[in-house]
Amino acid sequence: MSLLKHMSEFEKLIKKLDALTSSANTSCSEFTNLLIALGFQVENCGSAGHKIARHPAVSLIEYPNYNCGHNKGEAVKRPYIKKLYKFVKQHENAIKEHMK
């Protein structure tokens, strides 16, 4: 029963992430919170607004990144959301397993 509960949570989150790929205005905090709910560790990197999304279930040399812009409350551009969505779909099994 526990597996079904976690899978439905994962499915709900992935569906929300998919919806954001066509959204015109996704706030940085909404996007970041969704990634954290999927188990990502989000780190600020160097310049203003740039973030790296690492997932403990996936070992890579280079992880996907995104930009929140330079102003607080700025929207995340769709190409970044699509890149992270593709990453989650590529590593779906490992991320699902990690969420158990």
List each model region and its residues.
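A short, structured beta-strand/loop element
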Residues: L34-C68
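C-terminal basic regulatory modules in eukaryotic proteins
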Residues: S2, A19-A24, S29, P64-K100
